[in-house]
UniProtKB/Swiss-Prot annotation:
The protein's assembly and partners: The cytoplasmic dynein complex consists of two catalytic heavy chains (HCs) and a number of non-catalytic subunits presented by intermediate chains (ICs), light intermediate chains (LICs) and light chains (LCs).
Keywords noted in UniProt: Cytoplasm, Cytoskeleton, Dynein, Microtubule, Motor protein
Organism: Drosophila melanogaster (Fruit fly)
Domain of life: Eukaryota
Gene designation per UniProt: Dlc90F
InterPro entries, A to Z: Tctex-1-like, Tctex-1-like_sf
KO phenotype (gene knockout): Male sterility.
Annotated protein name in UniProt: Dynein light chain Tctex-type
Lipid metabolism keyword on record: no
GO biological process, one term: microtubule-based movement
An MF annotation (GO) of this entry: protein homodimerization activity
The organism's taxonomic lineage, starting at the top: Eukaryota, Metazoa, Ecdysozoa, Arthropoda, Hexapoda
Pfam families the UniProt entry points to: Tctex-1 (PF03645)
Membrane-spanning segments: none
GO cellular component: axon cytoplasm; cytoplasm; cytoplasmic dynein complex; dynein complex; microtubule; protein-containing complex
The UniProt record lists the keyword Kinase: no
């Protein structure tokens, strides 16, 4: 594969690492606090976007984040995309600590 094409691909492992770092930096070892969730989710998505756009890859990004208290409730989600499997991609990370779950999805759409 050509190096320039490799450099511009959506690499799931790299995106996953970016997401995990954004979550750890923002939430880390904090306990769930309802009044901070809105701020945390905003910071997580902004941190992800900042890192991803600094890479200057030819993508438009969509980032979603959800924080949920661990209280035994269930959660089911789904997403569907119509895109080019050769150039576009997605990555979802589920992170948790003792009191909460954080689920972040990044969709990369080639320009």
């Amino acid at each position: 594969m050509d190096d320039s094409r490799e450099e511009s691909q959506f690499i799931v492992d790299d995106v996953s690492k970016t997401i995990k770092e954004a979550i750890e930096t923002t939430i880390g070892g904090n306990a769930y606090q309802h009044d901070k969730v809105n701020n945390w989710t905003g910071q997580v998505v902004e941190n992800c976007l900042t890192v991803l756009t600094k890479e200057q890859k030819p993508y438009k990004y969509i980032v979603t984040a959800m924080i949920m208290q661990k209280n035994g409730a269930g959660l089911h989600t789904a997403s569907s995309c119509y895109w080019n499997n050769d150039t576009d991609g997605s990555c979802t990370v589920r992170w948790e600590n003792k009191t909460m779950y954080c689920i972040v999805s990044v969709f990369g759409l080639a320009v």
